[in-house]
Amino acid sequence: MGKTTWLLVLGLLLGGAALVAGMVLLAGRTSSSIATQQNNMTTATLQVRATTFNTDYARNADGPVWDLFDPQSQAIISRADYVDRHQHCPRPGVAPRITGISTGPNGYEIVNETLSGTVLHDYWHLVGGTWRFNLARSNPSAIALYREPRAKYFADLGCTK
């Protein structure tokens, strides 16, 4: 091969390498951009889910609230018992205001909220692609209450039943 042929081959190789490198860089940026967009969409979805959860809780729509519990939380109290206890001991109709969402440990997202000046932290995580509320992390004291006999539960909360 002559000198001109070698220069042509070298030029093609360098051009091809530059093209591949450029494609890799663009792919990296695109996947990063896609990951950022997906994370933003996921956070937006969580915000909507948590807002619905809080609104239902404030309205005493207890079945839909329990439905958003994760399996660990649903194992603590049955849906029927949760609904019954909350129907007989309703909460005031004020929903907390979401102030932000932050990344927590072990795949949980923390929905930061305020309610009448009290700061609350609800822990949510994806289960099968759906945001689910974790009672044990969000409100550990509720677990002890739900395990009490009904009469003691109502007495402890000052409810009539």
For each predicted feature, which ranges?
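Intrinsically disordered, low-complexity regions
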Residues: K3, L12, G16-A17, M23, ...
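Exposed beta-sheet edge and beta->alpha loop/turn motif
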Residues: R91-P92, G100-K161
